[in-house]
Design a protein with these regions (language model features):
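Membrane-interfacial helix-loop-helix
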Residues: 1-23, 47-171
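Hydrophobic transmembrane alpha-helices
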Residues: 16-37
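Proline-rich intrinsically disordered, low-complexity coils
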Residues: 33-35, 43, 124
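Short amphipathic helix-loop junctions that connect adjacent transmembrane helices
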Residues: 39-47
């Protein structure tokens, strides 16, 4: 059974659908390199805006939980990554550039990257967590707020694009 079938079967049981969307969002943040928008298709097509808002909040909460786990992991692994990177010039160069990117773009860069519909969240979350200059470039709570708000923004962008596209087709 694939994810689409699981979502389709659970769609008319809102608490189950929302729970699946939450769990899926955690996995998308942690390991799945696929977009979360799959969970939004059915309520968008049906025009169930209240249901869509509930699913959007569940997705934002799930992605935030996943981001918190990755942030914690990043704080614990960053020293090892830095030590390892000192052995090879290319790795040292990459780590320095990644730290500079995170330091320069900060919360705004993270928010903008995570707001892009159909983009994988996994890589930006890991980059901003692992190359956080020992937790000095990004503070945990603001990192989590940026993740949550970007997830909400992403649902809003997708919803607006869907409504505009649907209206253009009916014109």
């Amino acid at each position: 059974m694939d994810l689409l079938q699981i979502l389709y079967d659970a769609y008319n049981t809102p608490w189950l659908y929302i729970l699946i969307a939450f769990g899926y969002a955690v996995l998308v943040a942690l390991v799945l390199p696929i977009p979360i928008e799959i969970a939004l298709l059915l309520p968008l097509i049906d025009g169930r805006w209240g249901y869509l808002a509930s699913i959007g909040l569940a997705i934002a909460a799930g992605k935030t939980l996943g981001a918190w786990l990755i942030f914690w992991l990043g704080l614990n692994l960053e020293g090892s990554v830095r030590k390892w990177s000192e052995r090879w010039r290319v790795a040292r160069w990459f780590v320095a550039r990644a730290e500079r990117l995170v330091g320069k773009t900060g919360y705004t860069g993270l928010y903008l990257l995570l707001s892009v519909p159909m983009m994988s969240d996994t890589i930006p979350i890991y980059v901003y967590s692992l190359f956080n200059e020992e937790g000095r470039a990004l503070e945990r709570n603001m990192f989590l707020i940026a993740n949550f708000l970007a997830a909400i923004n992403r649902v809003a962008i997708l919803s607006m694009a869907f409504v505009i596209g649907a209206n253009l087709i009916h014109v």
